[in-house]
C-alpha cells in the first residue's frame, strides 16, 4: 500500500500478528450480525436498521437493534444498553479524519442511550476511546489540532485538491507558485497518477486563501478555454481537463 496524498509506499507491509500480506473481509455486515444475534437470542425481537432497511423509531418493547452508522433509530425512552462494534475496523479507513469522524459517530450513537445505560466500545483503546469514555470530545479535538499543526494537515491549513491531465495540473501548480511566492516549498503533494489523470494537493495558510484560490480559479478558466478552442485541422481537446476543489471535508483518496 501507499499514501494517497504523497505517494510514499509502506515497504515490507505485513500483518504484525501472522506476517501475511493478504487481505480479508473484517466485517460481516449488519444482516449477518442480526442473524447471528437472532440465533443467540432466539426469543428476542431483532430489528435491522441500515440504508436498505431504514427505521426511524422503535418502541419500548424488548428488542435487539442492529444499526449501521448514521442509521440508528430513536428508541422510546432511550436504549437500555449500547454496544459499538467494528470500532477497530472503522479506525483503519483510508481517511485522514477517520478518528474524529469515529468519535462523532460513536458519540451520536451513545447519546441515544437511556440515562445511566451502559455504552460499550468493543476492541478500541487509545485517545479516541478515552475521549468517548470520559465525554471529553473538545479536549480530543484540541489534541488533534496540536498534532496536525507540524504536519500541515487540515484544518490547521487549507487544502486544495487538483485533478486533471498532467499538463493541466502542472500548469496550475506553476501558476500558484508564481502568484504566491511565499508559499511553503513543501506545500504541494503530488502530482500522483489516478485512473483518469493525475491528482495533486496544495496546502496553504489561511492568510494566502484569497491569492491561492484566485490563481486556481484562473487556471480552471484558462484550461477550459484552451480545451474548447478549435485548432485548425484538428478536433478540440478533451473537456474538463482540470478540476479544483477547496476545503473539501472528506477528500476521496
Enumerate the language-model features and the residues they cover:
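Cys/His-rich short segments
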Residues: 1-39
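Residue-level detector of alpha-helical recognition elements and their boundaries
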Residues: 18, 30, 52, 120-121
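Short, charged N-terminal beta->alpha structural module
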Residues: 23-52, 169-175
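Accessory helical-bundle/CTD segments and flexible terminal tails appended to RecA-like ATPase motors
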Residues: 40-41, 53-99, 104, 108-253
Amino acid at each position: 500500500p501507499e499514501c494517497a496524498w504523497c505517494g510514499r509506499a509502506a515497504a515490507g507491509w505485513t500483518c504484525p500478528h501472522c506476517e501475511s500480506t493478504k487481505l480479508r473481509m473484517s466485517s460481516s455486515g449488519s444482516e449477518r450480525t442480526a442473524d447471528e444475534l437472532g440465533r443467540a437470542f432466539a426469543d428476542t425481537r431483532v430489528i435491522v436498521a441500515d440504508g436498505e432497511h431504514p427505521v426511524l423509531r422503535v418502541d419500548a418493547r424488548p428488542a435487539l437493534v442492529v444499526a449501521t452508522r448514521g442509521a440508528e433509530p430513536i428508541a422510546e425512552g432511550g436504549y437500555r444498553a449500547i454496544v459499538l462494534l467494528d470500532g477497530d475496523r472503522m479506525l483503519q479507513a483510508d481517511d485522514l479524519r477517520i478518528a474524529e469522524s469515529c468519535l462523532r459517530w460513536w458519540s451520536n450513537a451513545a447519546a441515544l442511550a437511556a440515562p445511566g445505560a451502559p455504552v460499550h466500545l468493543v476492541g478500541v483503546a487509545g485517545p479516541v476511546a478515552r475521549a468517548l469514555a470520559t465525554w471529553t470530545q473538545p479536549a480530543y479535538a484540541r489534541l488533534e489540532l496540536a498534532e496536525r499543526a507540524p504536519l500541515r494537515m487540515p484544518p490547521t491549513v487549507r487544502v486544495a485538491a487538483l485533478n486533471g491531465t498532467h499538463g493541466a495540473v502542472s500548469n496550475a501548480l506553476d501558476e500558484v507558485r508564481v502568484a504566491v511566492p511565499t508559499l511553503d516549498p513543501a506545500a504541494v503533494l503530488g502530482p500522483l497518477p489516478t485512473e483518469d489523470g493525475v491528482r495533486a494537493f496544495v496546502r496553504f495558510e489561511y492568510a494566502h486563501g484569497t491569492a491561492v484560490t484566485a490563481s486556481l480559479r484562473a487556471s480552471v478558466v484558462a484550461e477550459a478555454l484552451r480545451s474548447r478552442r478549435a485548432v485548425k485541422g484538428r478536433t478540440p481537446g478533451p473537456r474538463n481537463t482540470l478540476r479544483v476543489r477547496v476545503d473539501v471535508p472528506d477528500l476521496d483518496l
